[in-house]
């Protein structure tokens, strides 16, 4: 009789398991409530910041480092007008958090005063613009329809200033009157819109004000430029010059909150005493959530089960807080505080309380911007926990998540999340690594291995529910995993000096650190330009952005290479800071650009090789050359300070500064050439590259003219020959035999050739290559010498050893071959190794991890013009298992598998794990033809000639190939596999299909069995070693290995050996009970 009860069907066990799973995932709190009858008291010792000195601001001045800058709009009322306040968040020297509110700053813009406009017209102009703004506010429904006349008259402020347009030289002293309009950001926005239609400035009817100036400049950038405050710089407020707010008056959670007028701020240069860094607090976090089977966790349904946190003070070696908020019971973790929570609501509330208590300046982690933080905030919404979103320093403002599309040449196009955590900087390590480094893979495991030589256990989200459902020991393991994921980002920040480098970049360019993390490259140069313009009374015009399809310009010169393998030393002459030096030497700037020649050529103006005209230094010193001179001088000082400094942390700070200065100097040229930018000026960028091309050609001619055979008192054994030149360097063969001789002549050549150029343009000699393999333009390799005794490194440019668009096998093989060619100088050994690798590839002896190619999934398949291998594979993987399939922004690893002839490449791409599990044969011919052959041929052509590729891909080493039998696809689904004899491989009759061997091989059965057992023991030993290696990596000596790190070669080895072991075990089972009769004599 069939039961009517729910779940009483024949599928009852499956339904029961599903129901239990759903109940656990959706409402599994009761079990943990039983385990936690009372929530333990949280140990907050050491969380809070130091106590505030009561004399600060009263009898002692307040000095603080500014980390974050915000503006907020304050609406006017019946007795006051709109204003824009600026909040500066920072840290004092003693480690107290502070919020400085500047209440008397007004943003502004300019327009050129109309003919006849004078001081007597200011009142009329102000009244006209104020009335326009008031009318616009009424139309906008701002709720201020009946503003009193006094308030309306003060919506904006108008005054006359004198200056000139940044673009073009018009004479030595051509300052003209401009109208400056100041007010709140909202008032200025409405004024800017209304001015397009004309305004009655002089009481004689509407006047078209023409082009506006600086109306498109970010308010924060404008404020910092006006006050000379720089991002991450130090300011000081003298004692008694500010108003200290009481706790009831504070709008922020900072320990100190003051209001101060702009005039009372003392701004310090980032040198000497003020070059240091305050005790900045960095919080690194990682979350774990429990998803449903086959579905990646979704915040609307899937709860957070753990949040790991580490807090570190910049400059200290180790974190001073290590804790993990855990849902349920959890065994202790050495060195960490485990905070057990009865349910997810308690977990989130207590974690948010922890963040507010520890009060970090920087929040970091790996992919926290696009996953961890949005997930936490979304869960808080689902659970109706508004206080959890209050993670910032503003009391009444919660954190908000938005989508932010960014597009740049450096990072490509992508959509990130933008999160406002007021007063704190979100420093996502993933975003920093994406911006600053070109890697094959950007998983935390891969990046950690790249920079720290350390790996971590990578647990798939499908395994996390099992660990959470287990006991306190399995949850302890999950906590260890979570803590490691929070710890590694801190290690990476220290190793890469990312925070120090970004602090110094903020100081050099003047913009807040947050701008460097979230905005493009141009904001840095724009900030420096704006500051210099303020000092010299230049105004930046608003340039309408175009589509970027304007005409380009000719780039740098590349002297055609004389290709070959050079056993003799090749000297390299480099121009020091070429493009900045050209701009300084020839006074190239917006302010010196001429529409037509004026005066005497080379005295009053110069004509550049590209046909543009610029005023000489005698007429006007350009702003860009002044900026660049200051940057290069500051870099020289920073390098000297670094050289003389004994303290390691201060040395790191100086190194970060000199790197920031170097990057900034090299960015100025690109800023002028950006057609889609704030201040494009192709005349400058065209002239710079034209001068560069001319100088490379001049260098070639001069070197070959001076260093003839017998020159330099007979030290030149042959005529010098420039074999290659590229952008800012030339490679010269002087015909000498030793590196020391090449260095001596190279130093002399740099000194002599520099004489023909205008200072500060200077040739420098730094290195010699010996030997040198010149393959083509921008493709070469050689041993790099800066001292004559021993080489510094093997330097490769443009070769597959440093490129990411090939599989790792290519880089590995080319690297070994180059070592044999350049270091061992054994050409035959290099060729033999290449042939041996090709043979191993065709015989399926190459580990699959070396054949994986990965590409980023930046958009869905229908948005690509042609089908892409990684996009099509991602779609197939989604159909198999949507939960583990790659998502937008992920890098998709794939290999090429064998298929029928003429099947396109995008259909032959497959997931490496799927290939291993199903024993799918790889397309080794594709790897040889499309990946390995041409790169190898390129490095062997200078040695073997045009036949290099034929020698490599044909011959005895390519005749033996291994064919793998696939378990899926092709004919595998339509064929039945017949049992074969394990001895002679003959097909067994159907009646004997369960036997291990045929009748002819039965006498050899013990020998065959022993051989197969040996094979299985070898595989077991191999698997055991791999398993132990993974346990050591995960620090779990006795637990099961759950790691599935796709970037780790051990993972693929382990999976391959696991499959081989399974097949070997099946073979052993065919022998039945191992009781064999000894053969009769």
UniProtKB/Swiss-Prot annotation:
Gene Ontology annotations of biological process type: base-excision repair, gap-filling; DNA replication proofreading; DNA-templated DNA replication; nucleotide-excision repair, DNA gap filling
One Gene Ontology molecular-function label: zinc ion binding
Zn finger (CysA-type) start-end: 981-1001
Binding residue positions for Zn(2+): 981, 984, 998, 1001
Keyword Acetylation: no
Entry EC no(s): 2.7.7.7
Highest taxon, organism lineage: Eukaryota
Disulfide bridge partners, by residue number: none
Note on domains (UniProt): The CysB motif binds 1 4Fe-4S cluster and is required for the formation of polymerase complexes.
Further remark: In eukaryotes there are five DNA polymerases: alpha, beta, gamma, delta, and epsilon which are responsible for different reactions of DNA synthesis.
Oligomer and partners: Heterodimer with subunits of 125 kDa and 50 kDa. The 125 kDa subunit contains the polymerase active site and most likely the active site for the 3'-5' exonuclease activity.
Protein known as: DNA polymerase delta catalytic subunit
Source species: Caenorhabditis elegans
């Amino acid at each position: 009789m069939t039961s009517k009860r729910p779940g009483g069907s024949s599928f009852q066990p499956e339904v029961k398991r599903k129901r239990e799973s759903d109940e656990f995932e959706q409402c599994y709190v009761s079990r943990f409530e039983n385990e936690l009858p009372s929530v333990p008291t949280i140990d907050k010792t050491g969380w809070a910041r130091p106590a505030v000195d009561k004399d600060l601001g009263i009898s002692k001045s307040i000095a603080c480092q500014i980390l974050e800058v915000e503006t907020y709009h304050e609406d006017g009322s019946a007795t006051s007008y709109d204003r824009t306040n600026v909040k500066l968040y920072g840290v004092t020297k003693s480690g107290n958090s502070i919020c400085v509110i500047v209440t008397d700053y007004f943003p502004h813009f300019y327009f050129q005063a109309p003919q006849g406009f004078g001081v007597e017209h200011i009142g009329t102009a102000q009244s006209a613009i104020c009335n326009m703004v008031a009318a616009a506010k009424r139309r906008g429904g701002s709720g201020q329809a009946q503003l009193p006349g006094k308030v309306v008259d003060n919506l904006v402020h108008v005054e006359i200033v004198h200056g000139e347009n940044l673009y073009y030289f018009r004479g030595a002293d051509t300052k003209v009157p401009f109208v400056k309009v100041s007010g709140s950001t909202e008032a200025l926005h409405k004024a800017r819109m209304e001015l397009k239609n004309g305004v009655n400035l002089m009481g004689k009817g509407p006047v078209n004000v023409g082009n506006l100036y600086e109306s498109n400049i970010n308010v924060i950038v404008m404020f910092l430029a006006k006050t000379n405050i720089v991002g991450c710089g130090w300011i000081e407020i003298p004692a008694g010059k500010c108003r200290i707010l009481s706790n009831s008056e504070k709008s922020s959670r900072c320990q100190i909150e003051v209001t101060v007028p702009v005039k009372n701020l003392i701004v310090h240069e980032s040198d000497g005493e003020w070059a240091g860094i305050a005790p900045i607090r960095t919080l690194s976090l990682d979350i774990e959530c429990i998803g449903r089977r086959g579905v990646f966790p979704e915040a609307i349904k899937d709860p957070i089960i753990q949040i790991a946190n580490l807090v570190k003070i910049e400059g200290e070696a180790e974190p001073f807080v290590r804790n993990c908020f855990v849902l349920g019971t959890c065994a202790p973790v050495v060195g960490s505080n485990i905070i057990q929570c009865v349910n997810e609501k308690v977990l989130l509330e207590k974690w948010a309380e922890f963040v507010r208590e520890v009060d970090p300046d920087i929040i970091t982690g790996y992919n926290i911007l696009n996953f961890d933080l949005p997930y936490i905030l979304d869960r808080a919404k689902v659970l109706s926990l508004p206080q959890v979103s209050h993670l910032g320093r503003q009391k009444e403002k919660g954190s908000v998540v938005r989508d932010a599309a960014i597009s740049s040449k450096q990072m490509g196009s992508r959509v990130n999340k933008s999160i406002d955590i007021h007063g704190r900087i979100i420093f996502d390590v993933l975003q920093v690594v994406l911006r600053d480094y070109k890697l094959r893979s950007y998983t935390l495991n891969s990046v950690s291995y790249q920079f720290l030589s350390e790996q971590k256990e990578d647990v798939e989200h499908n395994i996390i529910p099992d660990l959470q459902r287990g006991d306190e020991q399995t949850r302890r393991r999950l906590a260890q995993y979570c803590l490691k994921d929070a710890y590694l980002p801190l290690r990476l920040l220290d190793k890469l000096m990312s925070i120090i480098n970004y602090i110094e970049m903020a100081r050099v360019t003047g913009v807040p650190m947050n701008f460097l993390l979230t905005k493009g490259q141009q904001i840095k140069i724009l900030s420096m330009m704006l500051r210099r313009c303020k000092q010299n009374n230049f105004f930046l015009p608003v340039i309408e952005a175009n589509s970027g399809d304007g005409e380009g310009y000719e780039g740098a010169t590349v002297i055609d290479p004389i290709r070959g393998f050079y056993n003799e030393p090749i000297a390299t002459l480099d121009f020091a800071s070429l493009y900045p030096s050209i701009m300084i030497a020839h006074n190239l700037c917006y302010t010196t650009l001429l529409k037509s020649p004026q005066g005497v050529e080379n005295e009053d103006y110069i004509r550049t090789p590209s046909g543009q005209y610029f005023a000489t230094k005698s007429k006007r010193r350009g702003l860009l050359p002044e900026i660049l001179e200051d940057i290069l001088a500051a870099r020289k000082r920073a390098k000297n300070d670094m050289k003389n400094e004994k303290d390691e942390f201060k040395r790191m700070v100086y190194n970060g500064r000199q790197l920031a200065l170097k990057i900034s100097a090299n960015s100025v040229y690109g800023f002028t050439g950006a057609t889609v930018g704030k201040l494009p000026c192709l005349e400058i960028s065209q002239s710079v590259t034209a001068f560069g091309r001319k100088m490379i050609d001049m260098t070639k001619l001069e070197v070959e003219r001076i260093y003839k055979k017998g020159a330099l008192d007979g030290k030149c054994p042959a005529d010098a020959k420039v074999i290659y030149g590229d952008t800012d360097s030339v490679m010269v063969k002087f015909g000498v035999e030793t590196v020391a001789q090449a260095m001596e002549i190279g130093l002399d050549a740099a000194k002599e050739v520099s004489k023909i150029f205008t200072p500060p343009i200077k040739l420098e000699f730094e290195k010699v290559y010996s030997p040198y393999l010149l393959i083509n333009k921008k493709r070469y390799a050689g041993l790099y010498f800066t001292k004559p005794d021993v080489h510094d490194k093997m330097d490769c440019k443009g070769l597959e050893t440093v490129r990411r668009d090939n599989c790792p096998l290519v880089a590995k093989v080319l690297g070994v071959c180059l070592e044999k060619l350049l270091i061992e100088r054994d050409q035959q050994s290099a060729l033999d190794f290449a042939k041996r690798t090709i043979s191993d590839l065709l015989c399926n002896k190459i580990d699959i991890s070396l054949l994986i190619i990965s590409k980023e999934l930046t958009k869905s398949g229908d948005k690509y013009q042609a089908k892409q291998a990684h996009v099509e594979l991602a779609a197939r993987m989604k159909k198999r298992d949507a939960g583990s399939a790659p998502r937008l922004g992920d890098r998709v690893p794939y290999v090429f598998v064998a298929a029928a002839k003429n099947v396109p490449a995008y259909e032959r791409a497959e997931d490496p794990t799927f290939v291993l599990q199903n024993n799918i044969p790889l397309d080794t011919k594709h790897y040889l033809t499309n990946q390995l052959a041409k790169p190898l041929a390129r490095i062997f052509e200078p040695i073997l000639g045009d036949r290099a590729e034929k020698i490599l891909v044909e011959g005895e080493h390519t005749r033996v190939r291994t064919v793998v039998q696939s378990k899926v696809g092709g004919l595998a689904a339509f064929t039945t596999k017949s049992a074969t004899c394990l001895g002679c491989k003959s097909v067994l009759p159907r009646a004997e299909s369960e036997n291990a061997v045929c009748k002819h091989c039965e006498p050899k059965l013990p020998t065959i069995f022993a051989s197969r057992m040996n094979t299985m023991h070898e595989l077991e030993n191999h698997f055991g070693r791999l398993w132990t290696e993974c346990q050591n990596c995960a620090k779990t000596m006795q637990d099961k290995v759950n790691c599935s790190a796709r970037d780790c070669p051990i993972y693929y080895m382990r999976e391959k050996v696991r499959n081989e072991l399974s097949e070997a075990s099946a073979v052993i089972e065919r022998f039945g009970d191992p009781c064999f009769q000894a053969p009769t004599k």
